[in-house]
Design a protein with these regions (language model features):
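Transmembrane signal-anchor hairpin modules in multi-pass inner-membrane enzymes, especially those
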Residues: 1-96, 102-140, 193-199, 228-243, ...
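TM-adjacent membrane-interface loops and short helices in multi-pass inner/ER membrane proteins
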Residues: 282-320, 334-340
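Extended, hydrophobic alpha-helical segments in both membrane/secreted and soluble proteins
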Residues: 216, 306, 326-327
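Flexible juxtamembrane loops connecting transmembrane helices in multi-pass membrane enzymes
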Residues: 168-172, 226-227, 254-287, 427-430
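Alpha-helical transmembrane segments of multi-pass inner-membrane proteins
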Residues: 33-46, 57-66, 91-98, 109-123, ...
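Short aromatic-rich membrane-water interface segments that cap or initiate transmembrane helices
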Residues: 48, 101-104, 166-178, 275, ...
């Protein structure tokens, strides 16, 4: 017992010495470095800055940092090279896409969402190369604290759902896959930087446990690829031993857990890793459906355009806001040129001699995961990607004009506060306030449409939506219902068939259409209008053909996933159609 106490005392003493050195190092850092370190450390805890209103807060904070830098130094430095050009074009493209986007209102929200990416890049340019590398050390510290807190909160029933998704630890991201890749990046940093063995052992162990508890199969595969790379890339023998021992213990622990509990969910989800898993197969369906759209739209469809248009071109039963591939997402959102520029900047970094091995490995793993997920929509992950890029080369511009900088910061801040407030109102359950503040806010308008009680209100709200977005099936369905209430079956048919075009796998739309056509046939027959009654009957008889056309267009992959198309009409409707023939 005495020996244990002595051992613990020594370890605590060593830890205190380490903490003292860390404090000394931090005290020597510049204010701008400390501000960026705080953003890199804290932003993952704020939902990873996923929501637009959080991105707006980040934009205002970064504008404030730049203004303070200008005040203290009298100038701002901008290195206009490949990396900055890619970031600038990316953000600008989100803004300009409003002129041709599927939804012009939501396109502006995309600009505000990714504005912090450009501002963060400008702040990075105010640091030296050595200071940039030091920011990466913040990543494992943030992941360590997040894992400890997430595990603790997951044991509290009151808040468990906020940290656990389908028995998988999701961290403060509330998304297990992004949480897992964040921890893997932390492991890579810990294995590559100089630090005490004790801290390295504890840090990697906790981060590895977090990955296992996340149940992310993709990150597990990347982890299996990363460990051998780190093992041979690391010169320190002690680090190699730590990596090998912890990796072996992790795999053995998961296998033992699965064997003893006969449970392959949650932590043991890795045991079901296969190319035939439904979640992986359906992603290939997303990609396959999107490729023709990418070729057809070289300028992209704007922010959220893919989400609103997918109902008209998808060949399976799914509905996703993101395509789960960041390269394809860029192509869909803002087109070929920005996507190619970003890709070139990444490839240039990976093959540059001026890029450290740590940066290359972090960038490679993050990009590999981005090919199967939407990590960069969490801006905290985008910030890490920016830290790994090569910012050298190009021409350096020095901005000394306070009026230009203050004006730009004020414009960006005002736009961010305006859009961010509207988004916050919507997220917090006040869509009427969101729509009042920002009328082109389609998501808020759609919710308000579902709450309308009269045909007139329904028609008016649908018209507001269709002014900025011609691809909302619910709006056309509402106009069809309004026309039906007014007895205008010609318009009802036009709008309902457009709604079906935009949501081809929604069986309820076909059933609703049949019900309205049946009433039309009865009313026209009673009124003695045989021509109109026959027209309605012809459209009703066409419904099975419409369904058959959709089924014929359905990709074989769609039948291999969990959510299969369900387009079989109930028996009474099938009998009704047969009786009309």
């Amino acid at each position: 017992m005495l020996e244990r106490c002595i051992f613990l005392t020594r370890q605590l003493w060593k830890l205190s010495e380490v903490m003292q050195k860390i404090i000394e190092k931090i005290s020597n850092k510049s204010h701008i470095w400390l501000a960026l370190a705080g953003i890199v450390f804290l932003s993952p805890f704020i939902y990873g800055l996923y929501h637009e209103w959080l991105a707006c807060i980040a934009a205002v904070a970064l504008c404030a940092i730049l203004l303070l830098r200008l005040r203290h130094n009298g100038q701002l430095r901008i290195q206009v090279g490949v990396s900055f050009a890619a970031v600038f074009v990316l953000v600008a493209a989100y803004g300009f896409s409003a002129f041709w986007a599927t939804d012009s209102g939501m396109a502006l929200m995309g600009f505000v969402k990714f504005l912090p990416v450009m501002l963060f890049s400008v702040v990075l340019m105010q640091l030296d190369t050595d200071e940039l590398g030091g920011l990466l050390r913040v990543v494992p510290a943030s992941g360590f604290v997040m894992t400890v807190l997430s595990f603790g909160f997951s044991r509290i029933p009151l808040v468990r759902e906020a940290f656990v998704v389908d028995s998988r630890l999701a961290g403060f991201f509330q998304y297990p896959n992004t949480y897992a890749i964040f921890l893997l990046l932390g492991i890579i940093v810990l294995a590559q930087v100089e630090c005490r063995l004790f801290l390295q052992l504890i840090g990697i162990a906790v981060l590895l446990l977090g990955i296992l508890m996340s149940g992310s199969r993709t990150v597990f595969i990347l982890l299996c690829a990363t460990v051998p790379i780190l093992f041979f890339a690391t010169k320190k023998k002690s680090t190699r031993v730590v990596l090998a021992a912890l990796a072996a213990a992790g795999v053995f622990g998961v296998a033992l857990y699965a064997y003893l509990t006969q449970n392959t969910s949650g932590m043991a989800r890795f045991m079901t890793t296969s190319l035939e898993t439904s979640t992986l197969i359906v992603r290939f369906l997303y990609f396959k459906d999107a490729l023709p759209i990418i070729l057809r739209c070289p300028l992209g469809m704007g922010y959220m355009g893919y989400y609103f248009e997918q109902g008209s071109f998808k060949t399976g039963l799914y509905s996703v806001a993101h395509i789960h591939n960041e390269l394809l997402q860029l192509l869909l959102d803002i087109g070929w040129i920005p996507a190619l520029l970003v890709s070139f900047a990444i490839l240039r970094t990976l093959f540059s001699k001026n890029t450290s091995r740590l940066q290359k490995l972090l960038l490679a793993m993050l990009c590999a995961h981005c090919m199967l997920d939407f990590d960069l929509h969490f801006l905290s992950m985008f910030f890490i990607l920016l830290l790994t890029l090569n910012w050298s080369g190009g021409k350096t511009f020095v901005i000394k004009s306070k009026s230009i900088t203050v004006t730009a910061a004020a414009i960006f801040s005002c736009i961010s506060i305006y859009i961010g407030t509207a988004n916050l109102m919507y997220i917090s359950g006040h869509p009427e306030m969101a729509a009042m503040l920002y009328p082109p806010y389609t998501s808020a308008q759609i919710y308000l449409l579902t709450q309308t009680t009269t045909a007139q209100q329904m028609n008016r709200r649908a018209d507001i939506i269709l002014q900025t977005n011609q691809h909302v099936a619910l709006a056309y369905s509402a106009k069809a219902r309004s026309a039906y209430a007014a007895g205008n079956f010609e318009n009802m048919i036009k709008y309902k068939e457009r709604a079906i075009e935009l949501t081809r796998y929604a069986l309820e739309e076909y059933i609703d259409y049949i019900n309205m056509l049946q009433v039309g046939i009865e009313l026209y027959t009673e009124a003695g209008d045989s021509v109109s009654a026959e027209f309605c009957r012809a459209r009703l008889l066409e419904v099975p053909n419409m369904i058959e056309a959709v089924l014929a267009d359905t990709d074989p992959i769609a039948w291999r996933v969990a959510d299969k198309p369900q387009l079989t009409l109930p028996q009474k409707y099938a009998e009704l159609i047969n009786s009309m023939q």
